[in-house]
């Protein structure tokens, strides 16, 4: 087997380090021994955008907030379904992730960061959510490993009751909060309901095909 080769590292605000590595044509981002992202598994990240933005294809000036740039799969899927007049804000906590997108991972991103619809906001995605006040038609969260925070302690605030109520307030009427997770989480689904959302839990394939592990996407809608 071809060994993993280290490309770069990124220190996290709460301590710990992300490692960008590759094995042949496959790129991975690791936190400790946990694989957070892989270039070979993009199906569920793409589903986060296609499901979360499903009703926005014909909405003029739709505004979408994406939490987490990752390897760009959610962003590119959102770009594919959103109209030319849309605005897409990507909040990314770790500056090196953006640097990697323009460097060793540029082949995955292609020219998606040059799209005039896209802007990058460095910092915690919770900040634009709290300041949102009915601004967003969709909020797509692929932050950490899902509601069970792994790499950033503050993500507990994002996925807790107060954070979900803030997300509800940041959505326009009829807007959708879409949340990715590696695992099911009954308690989180219940918190979504208590925050006022109508909740639809979907199982999606990590590969995007008919085989492979399932991930979870919650579609939490604000009443229109």
Spans of features found by a protein language model:
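C-terminal lobe and adjacent flexible extensions of AdoMet/dcAdoMet transferase-like proteins
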Residues: 218-224
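Short, surface-exposed beta-strand-loop junctions and turns on beta-sheet-rich folds
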Residues: 35-37
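Active-site beta-loop-alpha junctions enriched in small/polar residues
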Residues: 182-184
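The AdoMet/dcAdoMet-binding core of the Class I SAM-like
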Residues: 2, 42-171, 179-180, 190, ...
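Generic beta-structure capping elements
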Residues: 23, 32, 141-146, 223
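N-terminal auxiliary segments of SAM/dcSAM-dependent transferases
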Residues: 1-30
């Amino acid at each position: 087997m071809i060994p993993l080769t280290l490309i770069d590292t990124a220190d996290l605000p709460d301590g710990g380090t992300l490692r960008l590595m590759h094995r042949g044509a496959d790129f991975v981002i690791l936190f400790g021994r946990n694989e957070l992202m892989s270039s070979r598994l993009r199906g569920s990240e793409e589903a986060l955008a296609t499901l979360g933005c499903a009703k926005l294809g014909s909405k003029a000036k739709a505004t979408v907030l994406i939490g987490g740039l990752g390897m760009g799969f959610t962003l590119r899927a959102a770009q594919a379904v959103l109209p030319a007049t849309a605005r897409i804000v990507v909040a990314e906590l770790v500056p090196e992730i953006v640097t990697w997108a323009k460097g060793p991972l540029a082949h995955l991103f292609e020219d998606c960061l040059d799209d005039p619809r896209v802007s990058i906001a460095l910092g915690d995605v919770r900040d634009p959510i709290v300041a949102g006040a009915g601004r967003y038609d969709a909020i797509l969260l692929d932050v950490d490993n899902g509601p069970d925070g792994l790499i950033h302690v503050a993500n507990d605030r994002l996925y807790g009751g107060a954070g979900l109520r803030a997300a509800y307030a940041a959505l326009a009427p009829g807007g959708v909060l879409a949340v990715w997770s590696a695992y099911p989480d009954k308690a989180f689904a219940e918190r979504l309901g208590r925050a006022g959302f109508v909740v639809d839990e979907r199982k999606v394939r990590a590969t995007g095909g008919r085989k492979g592990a399932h991930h979870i996407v919650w579609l939490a809608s604000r009443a229109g």
